From Swiss-Prot:
Belongs to the UPF0301 (AlgH) family. This is UPF0301 protein PSEEN5058. NCBIfam families: PRK00228.1-1. InterPro entries: AlgH-like (IPR003774). It holds the Pfam family DUF179. One of its GO terms (cellular component) is cytosol. Gene3D superfamilies: VC0467-like (3.40.1740.10).
Length: 189
């Protein structure tokens, strides 16, 4: 008898289906950082907050004036879990105190990456989030079976080359899908 290994979605995008009712994830595009038998972790990459890197640096170093360039670096709502914790997805040409290498991408959670970005010596491409999306064991698989999400291959151009309001549509288009034409009804064979 053949056994099947589970299929995990690490290093892929999750596209929220148009009927997603959870306000934390409606109309979101999420990069999956980790997915295994214990659960999944991802970062929502298309929800900018009304914060920028200057705001964060003012909290970290209240006695120092952040560089003017940091006013142009948006902070994204990465998900509803630990919303006071920062996560930086970035190109992999440099690493920092708390950097995890992903496939052609890195994730850093230490403050030194923020200071490097502010000083103009950080990674060439980056996206900063507060919070993350987390799923318990089997939860994401159940949501996929309920047609809450579509998954598609990761494309760094979608994260780093497009405006936040274009990312969700671009990810769907990479599958040949127009989200506005989808229905909430689905069949299972």
């Amino acid at each position: 008898m053949k056994t099947f290994a589970p299929s995990y979605l690490k290093h892929q995008f999750l596209i929220a289906m148009p009927h997603m009712a959870d306000p934390n994830f409606a109309h979101t595009l999420t990069y999956i950082v980790e997915h295994n038998a214990n659960g999944a972790m991802g970062l929502v990459i298309n929800r900018p907050q009304e914060l920028n890197l200057a705001d964060i640096l003012e909290q970290l170093r209240p006695n120092e004036q952040p560089p003017a360039s940091t006013l142009q670096v948006p902070i994204y709502q990465g998900g509803p879990v630990q919303t006071d914790r920062g996560f930086v997805l970035h190109s992999d040409e440099c690493s920092f105190q708390a950097t995890v290498a992903l496939e052609g991408l890195s994730l850093t959670t230490s403050q030194d990456v923020l200071l490097a970005i502010a000083a103009g010596v950080g990674p060439k491409k980056s996206l900063i989030t507060l919070g993350y999306a987390g799923w318990e064991a089997g939860q994401l698989e159940a949501e996929l079976a309920d047609n809450a999400w579509l998954n598609c291959p990761f494309d760094p151009e979608i994260i780093f080359g497009l405006a936040s309001d274009q990312r969700l549509g671009a990810a769907a288009a990479s599958l040949g899908i127009n989200l506005s034409l989808l229905t909430s009804q689905a069949g299972h064979a």
